[in-house]
Amino acid sequence: MALKERIGTVVSDKMDKTVVVAVINRYPHPTYKKIVSKTTRYKAHDPENSCVLGDRVKIKETRPLSAHKRWAIEEILNKTIMSKEDKK
């Protein structure tokens, strides 16, 4: 089975070595054909604590690392510059 990859935005970095990544999936509604957006939040392993809020990242599927972590940060695509006032 191939490993899955997703691209999303970091929405929480308050845990140690873990970030929450929101991935938006767009698909047409089966009956009405309107494009529907569904947001899925994944907990991903960030061993160096290098991700901050707002970063655009690529995550990949991995073995279970904890009760809820099944994903790991593969690379940071766009880095966000956060000031100290924004962090609070």
Curated annotation (Swiss-Prot):
Record carries keyword rRNA-binding: yes
Alphabetized SUPFAM superfamilies for the sequence: Nucleic acid-binding proteins
GO cellular component, one term: cytosolic small ribosomal subunit
GO MF, one annotated term: structural constituent of ribosome
A GO BP entry: translation
A Pfam family recorded for this sequence: Ribosomal_S17
Keyword annotations of the record: Ribonucleoprotein, Ribosomal protein, RNA-binding, rRNA-binding
Domain of life: Bacteria
Biological role: One of the primary rRNA binding proteins, it binds specifically to the 5'-end of 16S ribosomal RNA.
PANTHER family: 40S RIBOSOMAL PROTEIN S11 FAMILY MEMBER (PTHR10744), SMALL RIBOSOMAL SUBUNIT PROTEIN US17M (PTHR10744:SF1)
Known partners and oligomeric status: Part of the 30S ribosomal subunit.
Family as reported in the entry's similarity comment: Belongs to the universal ribosomal protein uS17 family.
Descriptive protein name: Small ribosomal subunit protein uS17
Gene of this entry: rpsQ
